Amino acid sequence: TFGQAERASYDLAKDRVRLDGNAALRADDGAMLVAPRILYQRDNQKVIFPDGVELTQGMTRLVAPKGMVSLAVSDGPPEEIVLSGGVDVVTTVDATGALVEMWAKTVDSRRDPQGNWQVGARTDGPWITVRFTGGEDYFERTLHTLKMNAVIGPDGIISMQGDRGVCFQEIPFEGPPRSAEAETAQAWFSDGQLTDVELDGQVEVRAEQGVATGDRARLVQAGGLVMLQGDPTGRTRVGVESPRGRMSCDQATLYDREGRVEARGKVQGQLVDAQLLGASNTNLGGEPVRFAGETLEVIDKGEKFELRDNARVWQGHRLLVADDIRYDHSSQAVEARGHVRATFPAHEMDADASPDEDVVVVSRSLDYGGLVGRAVFRGSVHYSDPKHSLSANLLSIAFDDNDDISDVEAEGRVEIEDLEFGRRLTGQHALRDVESRTIRVTGSPAQLMDERGNIASGSSLTWNQADGTVSIDGGTELIYYPEEEPVAPGSPDDREESP
Protein backbone atom coordinates (compact mmCIF):
# COMPACT_ATOMS: atom_id res chain seq x y z
CA THR A 1 0.00 0.00 0.00
CA PHE A 2 1.33 3.46 -0.96
CA GLY A 3 0.32 6.64 0.94
CA GLN A 4 0.81 10.37 0.52
CA ALA A 5 -0.30 13.61 2.28
CA GLU A 6 0.66 17.24 2.91
CA ARG A 7 1.77 16.37 6.44
CA ALA A 8 2.70 13.11 8.10
CA SER A 9 3.65 12.04 11.63
CA TYR A 10 4.79 8.72 13.01
CA ASP A 11 4.35 7.49 16.61
CA LEU A 12 7.23 5.07 17.20
CA ALA A 13 5.84 3.79 20.51
CA LYS A 14 2.43 2.85 19.12
CA ASP A 15 3.63 2.13 15.57
CA ARG A 16 1.03 4.45 14.11
CA VAL A 17 1.06 6.86 11.17
CA ARG A 18 -1.03 10.01 10.79
CA LEU A 19 -1.56 11.68 7.43
CA ASP A 20 -3.15 15.14 7.15
CA GLY A 21 -4.12 17.32 4.21
CA ASN A 22 -5.29 15.66 1.00
CA ALA A 23 -4.20 12.30 2.34
CA ALA A 24 -4.43 9.33 0.00
CA LEU A 25 -3.72 5.62 0.06
CA ARG A 26 -3.34 3.42 -3.02
CA ALA A 27 -3.55 -0.39 -2.75
CA ASP A 28 -1.88 -2.88 -5.06
CA ASP A 29 -5.29 -3.84 -6.52
CA GLY A 30 -5.84 -0.25 -7.68
CA ALA A 31 -8.15 0.86 -4.86
CA MET A 32 -7.67 4.54 -3.93
CA LEU A 33 -8.74 6.07 -0.59
CA VAL A 34 -8.73 9.87 -0.23
CA ALA A 35 -9.51 11.72 3.03
CA PRO A 36 -8.71 14.94 4.95
CA ARG A 37 -7.10 12.84 7.68
CA ILE A 38 -5.93 9.24 7.82
CA LEU A 39 -4.90 7.34 10.94
CA TYR A 40 -2.91 4.18 10.17
CA GLN A 41 -2.63 1.69 13.04
CA ARG A 42 0.09 -0.67 11.86
CA ASP A 43 -0.12 -2.84 14.97
CA ASN A 44 -3.62 -4.07 14.06
CA GLN A 45 -3.52 -3.30 10.32
CA LYS A 46 -6.35 -0.76 10.43
CA VAL A 47 -6.76 2.54 8.61
CA ILE A 48 -9.24 5.00 10.16
CA PHE A 49 -10.87 7.96 8.41
CA PRO A 50 -12.45 10.08 11.20
CA ASP A 51 -13.28 13.07 8.98
CA GLY A 52 -14.71 11.27 5.97
CA VAL A 53 -13.35 9.24 3.09
CA GLU A 54 -13.72 8.72 -0.64
CA LEU A 55 -12.92 5.25 -1.95
CA THR A 56 -12.47 4.56 -5.66
CA GLN A 57 -11.90 1.17 -7.23
CA GLY A 58 -12.37 0.61 -10.93
CA MET A 59 -15.71 2.13 -11.94
CA THR A 60 -16.99 2.36 -8.34
CA ARG A 61 -16.82 5.35 -6.00
CA LEU A 62 -17.88 5.43 -2.31
CA VAL A 63 -18.16 8.54 -0.14
CA ALA A 64 -18.83 8.49 3.62
CA PRO A 65 -18.46 10.81 6.67
CA LYS A 66 -16.56 8.10 8.54
CA GLY A 67 -14.68 4.98 7.54
CA MET A 68 -12.33 2.23 8.59
CA VAL A 69 -10.28 -0.17 6.48
CA SER A 70 -8.73 -3.42 7.71
CA LEU A 71 -5.66 -4.45 5.69
CA ALA A 72 -4.24 -7.85 5.00
CA VAL A 73 -1.10 -8.83 6.92
CA SER A 74 2.15 -7.04 6.10
CA ASP A 75 0.37 -3.94 4.83
CA GLY A 76 -1.52 -5.94 2.21
CA PRO A 77 -4.62 -4.86 0.27
CA PRO A 78 -7.89 -4.00 2.07
CA GLU A 79 -9.79 -7.00 3.47
CA GLU A 80 -12.64 -5.12 5.15
CA ILE A 81 -14.11 -1.65 4.64
CA VAL A 82 -16.62 -0.17 7.08
CA LEU A 83 -18.29 3.12 6.10
CA SER A 84 -20.86 4.93 8.26
CA GLY A 85 -22.75 8.16 8.75
CA GLY A 86 -24.60 8.05 5.42
CA VAL A 87 -22.78 6.40 2.52
CA ASP A 88 -23.10 7.33 -1.16
CA VAL A 89 -22.03 4.78 -3.78
CA VAL A 90 -21.84 5.29 -7.55
CA THR A 91 -20.87 2.55 -10.02
CA THR A 92 -20.64 2.83 -13.79
CA VAL A 93 -21.36 -0.32 -15.80
CA ASP A 94 -18.55 -0.35 -18.35
CA ALA A 95 -20.48 -2.33 -20.99
CA THR A 96 -23.37 0.14 -21.35
CA GLY A 97 -22.46 3.24 -19.38
CA ALA A 98 -25.39 2.61 -17.05
CA LEU A 99 -25.15 3.97 -13.52
CA VAL A 100 -25.77 2.28 -10.18
CA GLU A 101 -26.29 4.71 -7.30
CA MET A 102 -26.82 3.73 -3.66
CA TRP A 103 -27.36 5.44 -0.34
CA ALA A 104 -27.18 3.65 3.04
CA LYS A 105 -26.58 4.61 6.65
CA THR A 106 -23.80 2.02 7.09
CA VAL A 107 -21.90 -0.16 4.60
CA ASP A 108 -19.67 -3.05 5.65
CA SER A 109 -17.61 -4.78 2.93
CA ARG A 110 -15.40 -7.88 3.26
CA ARG A 111 -13.23 -9.48 0.60
CA ASP A 112 -13.96 -13.20 0.14
CA PRO A 113 -11.47 -15.91 -0.95
CA GLN A 114 -12.55 -15.50 -4.60
CA GLY A 115 -11.57 -11.83 -4.55
CA ASN A 116 -15.15 -10.53 -4.58
CA TRP A 117 -16.54 -8.09 -2.04
CA GLN A 118 -19.35 -9.23 0.26
CA VAL A 119 -21.18 -5.98 0.97
CA GLY A 120 -23.75 -5.45 3.72
CA ALA A 121 -25.73 -2.23 4.14
CA ARG A 122 -27.83 -1.27 7.16
CA THR A 123 -30.00 1.63 8.25
CA ASP A 124 -31.99 2.65 11.29
CA GLY A 125 -33.48 5.70 9.63
CA PRO A 126 -34.18 6.47 5.96
CA TRP A 127 -34.41 3.45 3.67
CA ILE A 128 -31.41 2.16 1.77
CA THR A 129 -31.83 3.24 -1.85
CA VAL A 130 -30.21 1.58 -4.87
CA ARG A 131 -30.93 3.22 -8.23
CA PHE A 132 -30.07 1.77 -11.65
CA THR A 133 -30.25 4.19 -14.60
CA GLY A 134 -29.48 3.91 -18.30
CA GLY A 135 -29.87 0.14 -18.70
CA GLU A 136 -30.74 -1.71 -21.89
CA ASP A 137 -34.52 -1.85 -21.40
CA TYR A 138 -35.22 0.66 -18.63
CA PHE A 139 -34.84 4.36 -17.96
CA GLU A 140 -34.63 3.67 -14.26
CA ARG A 141 -35.05 0.87 -11.70
CA THR A 142 -34.96 1.63 -7.96
CA LEU A 143 -34.75 -0.65 -4.93
CA HIS A 144 -35.58 0.53 -1.38
CA THR A 145 -34.91 -1.69 1.64
CA LEU A 146 -33.90 -1.62 5.31
CA LYS A 147 -31.19 -4.26 4.97
CA MET A 148 -29.10 -5.03 1.89
CA ASN A 149 -26.45 -7.62 1.04
CA ALA A 150 -24.56 -7.69 -2.25
CA VAL A 151 -21.66 -9.43 -3.96
CA ILE A 152 -19.41 -7.18 -6.07
CA GLY A 153 -16.74 -8.58 -8.38
CA PRO A 154 -14.10 -7.02 -10.63
CA ASP A 155 -16.71 -6.48 -13.37
CA GLY A 156 -19.39 -5.00 -11.12
CA ILE A 157 -22.32 -6.23 -9.03
CA ILE A 158 -22.96 -9.97 -9.19
CA SER A 159 -26.04 -10.26 -6.95
CA MET A 160 -28.00 -8.24 -4.41
CA GLN A 161 -30.54 -9.07 -1.71
CA GLY A 162 -32.92 -6.79 0.19
CA ASP A 163 -34.47 -7.77 3.52
CA ARG A 164 -36.79 -6.48 6.26
CA GLY A 165 -39.13 -4.91 3.71
CA VAL A 166 -38.53 -4.03 0.06
CA CYS A 167 -39.97 -1.51 -2.41
CA PHE A 168 -39.07 -1.67 -6.10
CA GLN A 169 -39.94 0.71 -8.95
CA GLU A 170 -39.06 0.58 -12.62
CA ILE A 171 -39.67 2.79 -15.65
CA PRO A 172 -39.18 0.81 -18.88
CA PHE A 173 -38.57 2.16 -22.37
CA GLU A 174 -41.71 0.29 -23.49
CA GLY A 175 -44.81 -0.37 -21.44
CA PRO A 176 -46.17 1.28 -18.30
CA PRO A 177 -44.15 1.99 -15.13
CA ARG A 178 -44.68 -0.46 -12.30
CA SER A 179 -43.85 -0.83 -8.64
CA ALA A 180 -43.69 -3.70 -6.18
CA GLU A 181 -43.49 -4.39 -2.46
CA ALA A 182 -42.42 -7.52 -0.58
CA GLU A 183 -40.69 -8.78 2.54
CA THR A 184 -37.46 -9.67 0.70
CA ALA A 185 -35.95 -9.28 -2.77
CA GLN A 186 -33.18 -11.02 -4.70
CA ALA A 187 -31.64 -9.28 -7.73
CA TRP A 188 -29.44 -10.82 -10.43
CA PHE A 189 -26.92 -9.07 -12.67
CA SER A 190 -25.17 -9.68 -15.98
CA ASP A 191 -21.97 -7.74 -16.73
CA GLY A 192 -22.80 -5.50 -13.80
CA GLN A 193 -26.27 -4.67 -15.10
CA LEU A 194 -29.48 -5.55 -13.27
CA THR A 195 -31.55 -8.22 -15.03
CA ASP A 196 -34.18 -10.08 -12.99
CA VAL A 197 -35.62 -9.37 -9.55
CA GLU A 198 -37.36 -11.98 -7.38
CA LEU A 199 -39.69 -10.83 -4.60
CA ASP A 200 -40.74 -13.06 -1.72
CA GLY A 201 -43.37 -12.75 1.01
CA GLN A 202 -46.59 -10.70 0.82
CA VAL A 203 -45.82 -9.51 -2.71
CA GLU A 204 -47.78 -6.67 -4.28
CA VAL A 205 -47.10 -5.52 -7.86
CA ARG A 206 -48.75 -2.43 -9.37
CA ALA A 207 -48.84 -1.44 -13.04
CA GLU A 208 -51.04 1.23 -14.60
CA GLN A 209 -54.51 0.66 -13.10
CA GLY A 210 -53.96 -2.95 -12.03
CA VAL A 211 -52.53 -4.60 -8.94
CA ALA A 212 -51.36 -8.20 -8.44
CA THR A 213 -50.58 -9.97 -5.17
CA GLY A 214 -48.98 -13.29 -4.29
CA ASP A 215 -46.44 -15.09 -2.15
CA ARG A 216 -43.61 -14.81 -4.69
CA ALA A 217 -42.95 -12.86 -7.89
CA ARG A 218 -40.18 -12.63 -10.47
CA LEU A 219 -39.76 -9.48 -12.55
CA VAL A 220 -38.02 -10.56 -15.75
CA GLN A 221 -36.03 -8.03 -17.76
CA ALA A 222 -36.51 -9.84 -21.08
CA GLY A 223 -40.03 -9.07 -22.28
CA GLY A 224 -40.88 -7.01 -19.22
CA LEU A 225 -43.02 -9.75 -17.72
CA VAL A 226 -43.95 -10.56 -14.11
CA MET A 227 -44.39 -14.15 -12.90
CA LEU A 228 -46.39 -14.57 -9.68
CA GLN A 229 -46.91 -17.65 -7.51
CA GLY A 230 -49.09 -18.39 -4.53
CA ASP A 231 -48.04 -20.16 -1.36
CA PRO A 232 -47.58 -23.90 -2.16
CA THR A 233 -49.49 -24.71 1.05
CA GLY A 234 -52.50 -22.85 -0.36
CA ARG A 235 -52.68 -20.21 2.34
CA THR A 236 -51.90 -17.40 -0.11
CA ARG A 237 -53.09 -17.37 -3.73
CA VAL A 238 -52.22 -15.05 -6.56
CA GLY A 239 -54.68 -12.19 -6.94
CA VAL A 240 -55.05 -9.80 -9.89
CA GLU A 241 -57.36 -6.79 -9.76
CA SER A 242 -58.15 -4.03 -12.26
CA PRO A 243 -61.07 -1.74 -13.11
CA ARG A 244 -62.36 -4.55 -15.35
CA GLY A 245 -62.60 -7.07 -12.50
CA ARG A 246 -60.56 -9.35 -10.25
CA MET A 247 -59.44 -12.97 -10.06
CA SER A 248 -57.41 -15.44 -7.99
CA CYS A 249 -55.29 -18.40 -9.11
CA ASP A 250 -52.25 -20.53 -8.21
CA GLN A 251 -49.88 -18.71 -10.58
CA ALA A 252 -50.03 -15.89 -13.11
CA THR A 253 -47.80 -14.21 -15.69
CA LEU A 254 -48.27 -10.51 -16.49
CA TYR A 255 -47.06 -9.29 -19.89
CA ASP A 256 -47.22 -5.55 -19.25
CA ARG A 257 -45.88 -4.50 -22.66
CA GLU A 258 -48.54 -6.55 -24.43
CA GLY A 259 -51.35 -5.83 -21.98
CA ARG A 260 -51.81 -9.58 -21.45
CA VAL A 261 -52.25 -11.85 -18.41
CA GLU A 262 -52.03 -15.66 -18.20
CA ALA A 263 -53.43 -17.35 -15.08
CA ARG A 264 -53.24 -21.05 -14.17
CA GLY A 265 -54.49 -23.32 -11.43
CA LYS A 266 -58.05 -23.10 -10.07
CA VAL A 267 -58.76 -19.72 -11.62
CA GLN A 268 -61.81 -17.89 -10.33
CA GLY A 269 -63.00 -14.30 -10.27
CA GLN A 270 -65.52 -11.81 -11.56
CA LEU A 271 -65.98 -9.12 -14.22
CA VAL A 272 -67.72 -5.80 -13.77
CA ASP A 273 -69.50 -3.86 -16.49
CA ALA A 274 -70.08 -7.19 -18.26
CA GLN A 275 -73.07 -9.13 -19.58
CA LEU A 276 -73.68 -12.87 -20.05
CA LEU A 277 -76.28 -14.21 -22.47
CA GLY A 278 -78.78 -11.40 -22.07
CA ALA A 279 -78.33 -10.86 -18.33
CA SER A 280 -78.64 -7.31 -17.02
CA ASN A 281 -75.46 -5.23 -17.15
CA THR A 282 -73.94 -4.47 -13.75
CA ASN A 283 -74.30 -0.75 -14.44
CA LEU A 284 -78.05 -1.34 -14.59
CA GLY A 285 -78.11 -2.93 -11.16
CA GLY A 286 -77.48 -6.53 -12.20
CA GLU A 287 -74.93 -8.90 -10.71
CA PRO A 288 -71.30 -9.17 -11.88
CA VAL A 289 -70.21 -11.93 -14.24
CA ARG A 290 -68.37 -14.60 -12.25
CA PHE A 291 -66.08 -17.25 -13.75
CA ALA A 292 -63.96 -20.29 -12.89
CA GLY A 293 -61.65 -22.64 -14.79
CA GLU A 294 -58.16 -24.10 -14.86
CA THR A 295 -56.53 -21.47 -17.10
CA LEU A 296 -57.37 -17.93 -18.15
CA GLU A 297 -55.79 -15.61 -20.72
CA VAL A 298 -56.62 -11.90 -20.69
CA ILE A 299 -55.53 -9.82 -23.71
CA ASP A 300 -55.96 -6.28 -25.05
CA LYS A 301 -55.67 -4.80 -21.54
CA GLY A 302 -58.68 -6.66 -20.24
CA GLU A 303 -60.91 -6.33 -23.31
CA LYS A 304 -60.83 -10.06 -24.14
CA PHE A 305 -60.87 -13.14 -21.92
CA GLU A 306 -60.31 -16.79 -22.78
CA LEU A 307 -61.19 -19.33 -20.07
CA ARG A 308 -60.08 -22.92 -20.71
CA ASP A 309 -60.37 -26.41 -19.20
CA ASN A 310 -63.71 -26.91 -17.46
CA ALA A 311 -64.72 -23.28 -17.92
CA ARG A 312 -67.72 -21.94 -16.00
CA VAL A 313 -69.25 -18.49 -16.27
CA TRP A 314 -72.38 -17.32 -14.47
CA GLN A 315 -74.36 -14.17 -13.77
CA GLY A 316 -77.36 -14.33 -11.51
CA HIS A 317 -79.55 -17.25 -12.65
CA ARG A 318 -77.64 -17.65 -15.93
CA LEU A 319 -74.88 -20.25 -16.17
CA LEU A 320 -72.58 -21.26 -19.04
CA VAL A 321 -70.32 -24.33 -18.87
CA ALA A 322 -67.93 -25.49 -21.64
CA ASP A 323 -64.43 -26.74 -22.31
CA ASP A 324 -63.37 -23.25 -23.48
CA ILE A 325 -65.15 -19.90 -23.22
CA ARG A 326 -64.10 -16.61 -24.86
CA TYR A 327 -65.52 -13.19 -23.99
CA ASP A 328 -65.04 -9.88 -25.83
CA HIS A 329 -66.05 -6.93 -23.68
CA SER A 330 -66.29 -4.32 -26.44
CA SER A 331 -68.79 -6.36 -28.46
CA GLN A 332 -70.20 -8.29 -25.47
CA ALA A 333 -69.62 -11.43 -27.51
CA VAL A 334 -69.29 -14.92 -26.01
CA GLU A 335 -67.88 -18.00 -27.74
CA ALA A 336 -68.05 -21.43 -26.10
CA ARG A 337 -66.60 -24.65 -27.49
CA GLY A 338 -66.88 -28.26 -26.37
CA HIS A 339 -69.55 -29.77 -24.08
CA VAL A 340 -71.53 -26.53 -23.93
CA ARG A 341 -74.30 -26.27 -21.34
CA ALA A 342 -76.27 -23.04 -20.83
CA THR A 343 -78.92 -22.34 -18.19
CA PHE A 344 -81.53 -19.54 -18.21
CA PRO A 345 -84.44 -18.65 -15.89
CA ALA A 346 -87.54 -20.60 -16.95
CA HIS A 347 -89.88 -17.69 -16.19
CA GLU A 348 -88.45 -15.88 -19.24
CA MET A 349 -90.19 -18.50 -21.38
CA ASP A 350 -93.24 -19.02 -19.19
CA ALA A 351 -94.50 -16.42 -16.74
CA ASP A 352 -96.12 -19.20 -14.68
CA ALA A 353 -92.82 -21.04 -14.18
CA SER A 354 -91.27 -21.23 -10.73
CA PRO A 355 -88.29 -18.91 -10.04
CA ASP A 356 -86.23 -22.01 -9.27
CA GLU A 357 -86.93 -23.71 -12.62
CA ASP A 358 -84.48 -23.52 -15.53
CA VAL A 359 -84.21 -23.57 -19.28
CA VAL A 360 -81.22 -25.77 -20.20
CA VAL A 361 -79.50 -25.93 -23.60
CA VAL A 362 -76.76 -28.46 -24.40
CA SER A 363 -74.65 -28.30 -27.59
CA ARG A 364 -71.15 -28.54 -29.03
CA SER A 365 -70.68 -24.79 -29.52
CA LEU A 366 -72.21 -21.42 -28.74
CA ASP A 367 -71.83 -17.97 -30.31
CA TYR A 368 -73.49 -15.06 -28.55
CA GLY A 369 -73.58 -11.45 -29.73
CA GLY A 370 -74.55 -9.12 -26.93
CA LEU A 371 -75.02 -6.14 -29.22
CA VAL A 372 -77.47 -8.03 -31.43
CA GLY A 373 -78.97 -9.97 -28.53
CA ARG A 374 -78.84 -13.47 -30.00
CA ALA A 375 -77.27 -16.75 -28.86
CA VAL A 376 -76.69 -19.49 -31.47
CA PHE A 377 -76.08 -23.10 -30.37
CA ARG A 378 -74.71 -25.60 -32.89
CA GLY A 379 -74.11 -29.34 -32.97
CA SER A 380 -76.41 -31.97 -31.39
CA VAL A 381 -78.47 -29.31 -29.65
CA HIS A 382 -80.85 -30.34 -26.89
CA TYR A 383 -83.18 -27.83 -25.23
CA SER A 384 -85.40 -28.41 -22.20
CA ASP A 385 -87.68 -26.36 -19.96
CA PRO A 386 -90.26 -27.51 -17.39
CA LYS A 387 -92.88 -28.18 -20.11
CA HIS A 388 -90.93 -28.92 -23.30
CA SER A 389 -87.86 -30.56 -24.74
CA LEU A 390 -86.34 -29.95 -28.16
CA SER A 391 -83.52 -31.38 -30.24
CA ALA A 392 -82.05 -29.90 -33.44
CA ASN A 393 -78.83 -29.26 -35.32
CA LEU A 394 -78.99 -25.52 -34.57
CA LEU A 395 -80.84 -23.44 -32.00
CA SER A 396 -81.00 -19.65 -31.89
CA ILE A 397 -82.31 -17.72 -28.86
CA ALA A 398 -83.12 -14.00 -29.17
CA PHE A 399 -83.29 -11.54 -26.26
CA ASP A 400 -85.40 -8.38 -26.20
CA ASP A 401 -84.53 -4.93 -24.87
CA ASN A 402 -85.40 -6.10 -21.35
CA ASP A 403 -82.90 -8.98 -21.67
CA ASP A 404 -85.73 -11.53 -21.64
CA ILE A 405 -86.02 -14.35 -24.20
CA SER A 406 -88.27 -13.20 -27.06
CA ASP A 407 -88.11 -16.15 -29.44
CA VAL A 408 -86.40 -19.49 -29.98
CA GLU A 409 -85.60 -20.75 -33.49
CA ALA A 410 -84.46 -24.28 -34.35
CA GLU A 411 -83.12 -25.72 -37.61
CA GLY A 412 -82.21 -29.18 -38.88
CA ARG A 413 -83.99 -32.38 -37.76
CA VAL A 414 -86.15 -30.54 -35.27
CA GLU A 415 -88.05 -32.58 -32.69
CA ILE A 416 -90.22 -30.96 -30.01
CA GLU A 417 -91.88 -32.87 -27.17
CA ASP A 418 -94.72 -31.55 -25.03
CA LEU A 419 -93.92 -32.98 -21.60
CA GLU A 420 -97.40 -32.13 -20.24
CA PHE A 421 -99.60 -33.82 -22.87
CA GLY A 422 -97.20 -36.20 -24.63
CA ARG A 423 -97.33 -34.46 -28.02
CA ARG A 424 -94.36 -34.69 -30.37
CA LEU A 425 -93.71 -32.31 -33.28
CA THR A 426 -91.03 -32.89 -35.92
CA GLY A 427 -89.80 -30.90 -38.91
CA GLN A 428 -86.84 -29.07 -40.42
CA HIS A 429 -87.49 -25.68 -38.86
CA ALA A 430 -89.30 -24.38 -35.77
CA LEU A 431 -89.97 -20.93 -34.34
CA ARG A 432 -91.31 -20.32 -30.86
CA ASP A 433 -92.66 -16.83 -30.12
CA VAL A 434 -92.72 -16.25 -26.38
CA GLU A 435 -95.14 -13.31 -26.40
CA SER A 436 -97.81 -14.97 -28.57
CA ARG A 437 -97.14 -18.39 -27.02
CA THR A 438 -97.08 -20.11 -30.41
CA ILE A 439 -94.73 -22.67 -31.95
CA ARG A 440 -94.62 -22.93 -35.75
CA VAL A 441 -92.97 -26.01 -37.27
CA THR A 442 -92.24 -26.37 -41.00
CA GLY A 443 -90.74 -29.23 -43.00
CA SER A 444 -91.23 -31.84 -45.68
CA PRO A 445 -93.44 -32.69 -44.01
CA ALA A 446 -93.97 -31.26 -40.54
CA GLN A 447 -95.60 -33.85 -38.28
CA LEU A 448 -97.55 -33.95 -35.05
CA MET A 449 -97.97 -37.14 -33.02
CA ASP A 450 -100.27 -37.07 -30.01
CA GLU A 451 -100.17 -39.23 -26.92
CA ARG A 452 -102.35 -41.89 -28.63
CA GLY A 453 -100.08 -42.25 -31.65
CA ASN A 454 -102.34 -40.32 -34.04
CA ILE A 455 -100.27 -38.48 -36.68
CA ALA A 456 -101.07 -35.27 -38.52
CA SER A 457 -98.72 -33.86 -41.16
CA GLY A 458 -98.52 -30.89 -43.48
CA SER A 459 -96.14 -28.27 -44.78
CA SER A 460 -96.48 -26.39 -41.49
CA LEU A 461 -97.91 -26.83 -37.99
CA THR A 462 -98.82 -24.01 -35.62
CA TRP A 463 -99.26 -24.92 -31.98
CA ASN A 464 -101.16 -22.37 -29.91
CA GLN A 465 -99.99 -23.05 -26.38
CA ALA A 466 -102.61 -20.74 -24.87
CA ASP A 467 -105.55 -23.00 -25.85
CA GLY A 468 -103.65 -26.19 -26.75
CA THR A 469 -104.85 -26.32 -30.38
CA VAL A 470 -102.71 -27.21 -33.40
CA SER A 471 -103.51 -25.91 -36.89
CA ILE A 472 -102.15 -27.68 -39.97
CA ASP A 473 -101.49 -26.04 -43.34
CA GLY A 474 -100.52 -27.32 -46.77
CA GLY A 475 -101.15 -30.86 -47.98
CA THR A 476 -102.68 -32.13 -44.76
CA GLU A 477 -102.52 -35.85 -44.07
CA LEU A 478 -104.01 -37.58 -41.03
CA ILE A 479 -103.48 -41.03 -39.59
CA TYR A 480 -106.06 -41.65 -36.86
CA TYR A 481 -106.40 -44.64 -34.57
CA PRO A 482 -109.99 -44.68 -33.17
CA GLU A 483 -110.49 -45.92 -29.66
CA GLU A 484 -112.40 -49.25 -29.35
CA GLU A 485 -115.13 -49.23 -26.73
CA PRO A 486 -114.91 -52.08 -24.22
CA VAL A 487 -117.24 -55.11 -24.93
CA ALA A 488 -119.95 -55.67 -22.28
CA PRO A 489 -120.19 -59.21 -20.88
CA GLY A 490 -123.16 -61.14 -22.36
CA SER A 491 -123.62 -58.72 -25.25
CA PRO A 492 -124.03 -60.02 -28.86
CA ASP A 493 -120.45 -58.98 -29.61
CA ASP A 494 -119.30 -60.88 -26.57
CA ARG A 495 -121.25 -64.02 -27.58
CA GLU A 496 -119.82 -63.90 -31.12
CA GLU A 497 -116.32 -63.95 -29.75
CA SER A 498 -117.11 -66.77 -27.27
CA PRO A 499 -116.25 -70.37 -28.40
Show where each model-derived region lies.
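Mature-chain termini and adjacent capping regions
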Residues: 1-499
